[in-house]
């Protein structure tokens, strides 16, 4: 005897099969012809300027989000350079440690805004092209609106050239931030008494401690870049373009210059008023830092005068020991690019 559950399952399977057959039997699924407009992966713009309205970073030292600016420059087929800056919009959006410090900190240390600077270059160890294929979606102007949203888009595989770059990366990283020392103490098994003043006395128990961290370091690593710059004209569809510049990379991070601000604490009397005469500075030296780290990332942009780009990376950043893990996502729009070549040949009559 067939139960209701079995009957319902059979109906669902039949419906799925009918949809699959219907999609495979589409009337517009016919062979297409095309004409190549260009296929030149070496003819890309030289300068790209990225405006980043939003990035987000899960960083154990300080969770943060904000805005940024980035620029990259390609020097012939030998080198490319990149400079990047980002910071938080405000302590509320989103500078977690700074915001928390201003709410609950018991120490007198100022709260540092999160700032991040990165600059470096990539040497093209091997820069070459090889035969490849790319998938292009087939689109008609008649697909606008609901028609496009209601259909599974067809795609065609187009032969093209892909440019590959094996790169060697080197650069510098500078960043500073507020940080929660209470969490660092938990990670390293420390107590308040481990922070001593000039008289050898420890910091009183129960004090919520926040400080600031500043680092200067280097990164060295490798990258692999794929560049396609191809356009074709289809006979019954709109022009297809694939101009993606995709880069993956892995870096070793080294920061020999890491500084933490010492703790400045002023005790309060029974009425909650600070006792200025008893203000003391306590050494932060008990907190261990980690000089080495790593990261892996991916970045994508398009070889167009006006477009957008994306990027993501994760790893372990040199910082307070045990507080270096991070994962970051960034979106850029708009991205302006140009080849910086406006000369044309002129001949006398």
Regions found by a protein language model. Give the residues of each.
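Repeated loop/turn-to-beta-strand initiation elements of outer-membrane beta-barrel proteins
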Residues: 77-83, 127-132, 230-232, 303-311, ...
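Short glycine/proline- and aromatic-enriched beta-strand/turn motifs that initiate or cap beta-hairpins
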Residues: 23-89, 175-182, 334-336, 349
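Outer-membrane beta-barrel transmembrane domain signature
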Residues: 31-33, 173-310, 316-320, 333
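Outer-membrane beta-barrel biogenesis signature
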Residues: 22-48, 130-161, 234-243, 338-349
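Glycine- and aromatic-enriched membrane insertion/assembly motifs of diderm outer-membrane
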Residues: 62-128, 252-257
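Residues that define the transmembrane beta-barrel architecture of outer-membrane proteins
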Residues: 45-47, 61-67, 111-119, 164, ...
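Outer-membrane beta-barrel "beta-signal"
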Residues: 116-130, 323-349
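Transmembrane beta-strands of outer-membrane beta-barrel proteins
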Residues: 48-54, 82-86, 133-140, 166-173, ...
